[in-house]
Amino acid sequence: MLDKPCIDHRIYTIRLRKMNEFLDVFDRLAMPVLLETLGTPLGFYTSHVGPQNQFVHLWAYESLADYERRSRLRDTHPDFPAYLAASEHLIVAQETRLIRAVDLASIKHLWRPEGYGRQ
């Protein structure tokens, strides 16, 4: 079980044949800001089966208030507009979902104490 129960599950749909360009822009311009303001991510993924050209990232938060506080830090960071401008033409759609962890007794023994993955 994750120690931060609120997860930002974000999905970007990227223009056809532009994923590599998007990943470069994201890594160079967004990641420094995100690491500084949001902290360590849970992971990054691209779609393999199902809808294509999608980039997914997951960030964990203590609460909705923690999500809102760190999101404000990101949105007001002086370097963040450069990423927004550089990526605007690459993104077709964005979905942002806040999902909550479910604590199931039947699988508690599968998770490490620090909460990030199976033993």
Q: Can you say where each PLM-predicted feature lies in the sequence?
A:
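Surface-exposed interaction/gating patches
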Residues: 1-25, 32-33, 40-41, 103-106, ...
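Short, well-ordered beta-strand segments in beta-rich or mixed alpha/beta enzyme
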Residues: 6-13, 45-75, 95-97, 110-116
